[in-house]
Amino acid sequence: MASIAVCPGSFDPVTYGHLDIIKRGAKVFDQVYVAVLNNSSKKPLFTVEERMELLREVTRTLDNVHVESFHGLLVDYARSKKANAILRGLRAVSDFEYEMQITSMNRVLDENIETFFMMTNSQYAFLSSSIVKEVAKYNGDISELVPPVVEAALKRKFASAVAD
């Protein structure tokens, strides 16, 4: 049986921390579905389509990684992909309590789908999409935080926001 994992997130935008987890997950699992959350209650900077395009660009060399969007329950999406695992990244102990609650709920919904946690590389332990957006908004250097294609997309977004 193939090992198939779903790696969910909003990825608004994708950071080197996200990419670290995706790349390492791609070494462990036969297939990894990067599932971009389409949540209409949030106000993301990038559209779902833009986030998916950025993710596809930065994972294009990973043959076993697929980028899709989903809405609704994660376990329903995982079932639709015949996934037996959910892959989550942890930055710090502070992430663990929230992730444990979500994992417990997912186990109630489908006990056949296991959640695997990977600690992010320590150099990205502080990193979040929110921090990246805040630094980029004020024209700070984000070259060590996101891939070049994401940096360029952020600069375009904030330049157009200023122009509007």
Curated annotation (Swiss-Prot):
Associated pathway: Cofactor biosynthesis; coenzyme A biosynthesis; CoA from (R)-pantothenate: step 4/5
Domain of life: Bacteria
GO cellular component: cytoplasm
Coiled coil: none
GO molecular function: ATP binding; pantetheine-phosphate adenylyltransferase activity
Broad class of the protein's primary localization: cytoplasm
GO annotation (BP), single: coenzyme A biosynthetic process
Feature type site, description Transition state stabilizer: 18
Function as written in the Swiss-Prot or TrEMBL entry: Reversibly transfers an adenylyl group from ATP to 4'-phosphopantetheine, yielding dephospho-CoA (dPCoA) and pyrophosphate.
Keyword set includes Protein transport: no
Pfam families (alphabetical): CTP_transf_like
Keywords tagged on the record: ATP-binding, Coenzyme A biosynthesis, Cytoplasm, Magnesium, Nucleotide-binding, Nucleotidyltransferase, Transferase
Cofactor(s), by name: Mg(2+)
Oligomeric and partner information: Homohexamer.
EC number(s) from the headed UniProt entry: 2.7.7.3
Chain positions recorded as ATP binding sites: 10-11, 18, 89-91, 99, 124-130
Family: Belongs to the bacterial CoaD family.
InterPro entries in UniProt: Cyt_trans-like, PPAT, Rossmann-like_a/b/a_fold
UniProt-recorded name of the protein: Phosphopantetheine adenylyltransferase
Class of this enzyme: transferase
Places the protein is found: Cytoplasm
Catalytic activity reported: (R)-4'-phosphopantetheine + ATP + H(+) = 3'-dephospho-CoA + diphosphate
Sequence positions that bind substrate: 10, 42, 74, 88
Source organism phylogeny: Bacteria, Bacillati, Bacillota, Bacilli, Bacillales
